[in-house]
Regions:
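Flavin (primarily FAD) cofactor-binding/catalytic cores of flavoenzymes
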Residues: 1-37, 77-181, 185-400
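Charged, glycine-enriched surface loops/patches
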Residues: 40
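Flavin (FAD/FMN) cofactor-binding and adjacent substrate-gating region
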Residues: 44-75, 228-251
Length: 400
């Protein structure tokens, strides 16, 4: 049976960055599984823009050289800001070709304990044993669907992650549920696709990002103040951004304070550049969906104010709820062995779980290391921490 030292499950930003860092270890037998950038390419809508700032959109590389600027130069194209989804996907694929050209695009069907570490079964039945497993499988398995919509067929109710193009909704009535970036940008894209859109959110008001300075003050003081109040990682509001950029500090804070920081940093909010695009889209605040049922080929939705809507489709911009038991490739005995909190794995140094030599990167690491792990800008910390854990040495790598 084939063996390796490390198997990485997932070929998105976290999996690719981890692989690039581990490839610097001489003699390490590394395998990477997954379709590169697949979630970004297949489960996010065409026309989307990344909410994160330019400085927070690089996939970390051990030499700090595979940046957005490097891709612009190599591809002879100029990125706009905010960064369009399609350009970021192409950047990720370029990163993969440069740093991790030998990705195995087969899916991992099962991971189970083995005497020498872990036994992996691939989708075609091939098996291998790896001494260490890095789970960088993203958030696709965690799409949250409120119970009010259980039982409704996908013809009338879907999560935003189930779409890569909203043009099919042209001429249809769509109710969008949610008040964060996903819901608001989906509402804008649907409106631009000539759908009849309404957004419903339980929030008393919408929160908009990057609105903390007036335009006049921005040009006078913006750059200086931003350097003081905001880390390049671009996670969290002024005052806590610099703290959240340091997961090694965050993880040592009292648990209740960590939870408050994570809640504040990741509360539903939209990028300010959506404001103009949402003009003409009705947005109902302080409203929740009580129930929903089929009405012929449509869906009837009941709100908590007693009103009803009968629409062609309900789009759930309701985010993601981490629960690693929903990673279908993890054998039940592994899941049972993992120490968890609210669905998150409890991790220690190197993002290692309670199962020795099994690590979790990306959003599942947020409970232990803070909300930075939910964003691309967290790849730098995660990859360096992982490398340090495996080699027993400080990374000693250049700044990005």
């Amino acid at each position: 049976m084939t063996t390796c030292d490390v198997a990485i499950i997932g070929a998105g930003p976290y999996g690719l960055s981890a692989a690039a860092h581990l490839r610097t270890v001489k003699g390490l037998e590394l395998r990477v599984f997954g379709v590169p950038m697949s979630f970004w390419n297949r489960n996010m809508p065409a026309g989307m823009f990344l909410r994160s700032a330019w400085t927070a959109t690089h996939v970390a590389h051990p030499a700090g050289c595979l940046t957005l600027e490097a891709y612009q130069a190599a591809s002879r194209q100029q990125f706009s800001t905010p960064v369009p989804l399609d350009q970021f996907v192409q950047y990720g694929l370029w990163y993969q070709r440069q740093a991790v050209p030998d990705v195995d695009q087969r899916a991992v069907a099962t991971v189970e304990p083995a005497p020498m570490g872990f036994r992996l079964y691939l989708e075609d039945g091939e098996a291998l044993v790896s001494r260490r497993v890095i789970v960088a499988a993203g958030i696709g398995a965690f799409a949250y669907r409120p119970p009010q919509f259980f039982g409704l067929p996908p013809s009338v109710a879907t999560h935003t992650s189930e779409h890569s193009d909203f043009r099919d909704f042209c001429g249809k009535s769509v109710l969008v549920v949610g008040g964060g970036q996903s819901a608001l940008e989906s509402g804008a894209l649907l409106h631009e696709a000539r759908a009849d859109v309404e957004i419903v959110t339980r929030a008393p008001r919408l929160h908009w990002l990057q609105g903390w300075l007036s335009h006049a003050l921005h040009y006078r003081l913006g750059a200086f103040i931003k350097q003081l109040l905001y880390a390049p990682t671009d996670v969290g509001p002024a005052g806590i951004s610099q703290l959240l950029a340091r997961p090694e500090i965050v993880r040592r804070l009292p648990r209740d304070l960590q939870d408050k920081l994570r809640k504040r940093a990741t509360r539903p909010a939209g990028a300010r550049w959506l404001v103009e695009r949402l003009k003409g889209v009705p947005i109902r605040l302080r409203r929740s969906v009580v129930s929903a049922e089929l009405a012929g080929e449509q869906v009837k939705v009941h709100l908590d104010d007693g009103s009803e809507r009968t629409v062609d489709h309900v789009l759930l911009g309701t985010g993601y709820k981490i629960d690693i038991s929903k990673y279908g490739f993890l054998a039940p005995e592994l899941v049972q062995s993992l120490r968890r909190s609210n669905g998150f794995p409890v991790l220690k140094d190197g993002l290692e779980s309670s199962v020795p030599r099994m690590h979790f990167l990306g959003a599942p690491a947020a409970w232990s290391f803070g909300p930075l792990m939910q964003f691309v800008s967290g790849t730098r910390y995660a990859s360096r921490s992982l490398l340090r854990c495996i080699t027993g040495k400080a990374a000693g790598l250049p700044q990005p």
